């Protein structure tokens, strides 16, 4: 590929781990890495305004190709001037390929060499998504970073199935590259698959690196495997990817997974976790997970997280948040969502500083102890 709109600049490597401090330059601005990306499934991060996301330090957000294709339609978004104008967001946007949603949401999937036939989860109509169509949709959306169409096999699928799957994903990636109409202003990433099989991850990475994408994603994780299994896959996968290009771990947002991914050389992460759990009153704090809807907080007039300086924690008490959530007030969801997003974005800011100071392992140990990991199993 000759025109590369996405560039990675390495600033510093951490002395004791594979972590790296850098920045990614896109047509809509530059953001620091490692970075957690809030997910705006339907062209909005649930309950958050663009101004709030900018204020908390979100340098890039993610939107979902599958959902925007179905509603309101990628051609409508193109007529609006692209996703940035449509949602009034002037910073970088990443779109996924739609593949994961097809496999996780849609019914009656039929995978062939041409693509995937499935039922629309909204109205049951029959639809078809191919590598070329996934690229066309994302070209219409106009995201800065877009994803190749891939199959995301379950982590514990048999070896023979996963081998056929990654070989097809490589062929789909090549087809997507050929179909890409806007290589001058949209960077297309290849997605490494292979479940937990090292040789298949190696084969997948080799195939994709030979195609010279401007960046690479690691897919097929955070789909039911253990934390240790995820780390093991990252241990043998990230070294296969070029050092001069971004590395994106898809669908990961638990604090320990973010830190451990950074230690293994990952630059970008996304997950719906912070906003999804916030809607149920579950909040991440510096002292671990807290379910603010619980009765014990009915008369707790302290901040949600006394160690956090976000808008929610500076202005509202646990008792008030509990009241809002119990009364089904949208403002309560806004406040808990703001806090959880701020928490992860600020965590990554602190991780970047730890890389600069060459003390990421000490940072990890201190964070894990305070958060409560290991006391009652994993505690996201």
Curated annotation (Swiss-Prot):
Catalyzes the base-exchange of a guanine (G) residue with the queuine precursor 7-aminomethyl-7-deazaguanine (PreQ1) at position 34 (anticodon wobble position) in tRNAs with GU(N) anticodons (tRNA-Asp, -Asn, -His and -Tyr). Catalysis occurs through a double-displacement mechanism. The nucleophile active site attacks the C1' of nucleotide 34 to detach the guanine base from the RNA, forming a covalent enzyme-RNA intermediate. The proton acceptor active site deprotonates the incoming PreQ1, allowing a nucleophilic attack on the C1' of the ribose to form the product. GO terms for molecular function: metal ion binding; tRNA-guanosine(34) queuine transglycosylase activity. Its EC number is 2.4.2.29. InterPro entries: ArchSynthase1/Queuine_TRR, TGT, TGT-like_sf, tRNA_ribo_trans-like. The active site is at residues 96, 270. One of its GO terms (cellular component) is cytosol. GO terms for biological process: queuosine biosynthetic process; tRNA wobble guanine modification; tRNA-guanine transglycosylation. Pathway: tRNA modification; tRNA-queuosine biosynthesis. Belongs to the queuine tRNA-ribosyltransferase family. This is Queuine tRNA-ribosyltransferase. The gene is tgt. Keywords: Glycosyltransferase, Metal-binding, Queuosine biosynthesis, Transferase, tRNA processing, Zinc. Residues 251-257, 275-279 are annotated as: RNA binding. It catalyses: 7-aminomethyl-7-carbaguanine + guanosine(34) in tRNA = 7-aminomethyl-7-carbaguanosine(34) in tRNA + guanine. Pfam families: TGT. Substrate binds at residues 96-100, 150, 193, 220. Homodimer. Within each dimer, one monomer is responsible for RNA recognition and catalysis, while the other monomer binds to the replacement base PreQ1. Signal peptide: none annotated. Its cofactor is Zn(2+). Binds 1 zinc ion per subunit. PANTHER family: QUEUINE TRNA-RIBOSYLTRANSFERASE. Zn(2+) binds at residues 308, 310, 313, 339.
